[in-house]
Amino acid sequence: LEPHGLKFVSGWHSLNLLTHSVEDEKKAIQPHLDLLKAMGCKVCIVCETSNAIHGNDDAALNNSPVLAGDQWAKFGADVELIAAYCADQGIDLVYHHHMGTIVETADEIHAFMDSTGPKTKLLLDTGHAWFGGADPKELATRYMDRVGHIHCKNVRPAISKQVREEGLSFLEGVRRGVFTVPGDAEGGVAFEPVLKIAGEHGYSGWLVIEAEQDPNVRNPFEYQSLGLKSLRDMAEKTGLDKGDI
């Protein structure tokens, strides 16, 4: 990566705390932590996937798994133990709220944040928040002090409506183009309010452009270039970019 001026920021690790013990999950995450530490990464991206449906083409996104109210306390406590385990090795655990998982909606994000402690950080994903019915600005306002990583993903409202009304899977939504980059006129996510709040709270982590799209339909170079330019312009306008990125 270095010859191309690139850095390895982090990587996804699937948690299975609903079906495995904390000790087993510590063992499972350790090789990933070793890689992150070797690469100089600061955050470890995690998400509970034991009952997730985002990778199942036969499952309608409308049928995302739901965690019973009396299960949140234990789940949150277990995540906090894994977060402490990561923190002891110099890595912040950042939890990715994600479509097709138990932490998808605004209420679920709030329940998760309420049931975890200070070691657990939030990966604020603007696209997954919007798609899940949450307001990215409201999440930023409420939780920025615990946000450790930001994914700047846009959503095409017309496609997200199709996913809901036609009972499509998450994967089919992605194939149809539900996600796109910052700056795309077809997108519905307002990024500037989130970036402004991040700047006001002294956020110094990464802003990651994410937008899984069919490369045969939408040119990756063109869209990534649009996303990067738009995000840089917005970061500068809102005061988040101090001129050193």
Which residues does each predicted region cover?
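Short, solvent-exposed loop/turn segments at secondary-structure boundaries
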Residues: H20-E25, A134-P136, R218-E222
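Active-site acidic/histidine proton-transfer and metal-coordination neighborhood
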Residues: T19-L124
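Acidic (Asp/Glu)-rich catalytic clusters
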Residues: L1-G11, K27-C41, E80-D88, F112-G117, ...
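The substrate-binding groove and active-site-proximal loops of carbohydrate-active enzymes
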Residues: W12-E23, G69-W72, V178-A185
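Conserved, mostly hydrophobic/aromatic
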Residues: L1, L36, L93, D125, ...
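Short acidic/histidine-rich active-site segments
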Residues: V208-E212
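C-terminal helical cap(s) of enzyme catalytic domains, especially alpha/beta-barrels
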Residues: R218-G243
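Acidic/histidine-rich catalytic cores of soluble enzymes
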Residues: G11, A77-D184, G188, E236-G243
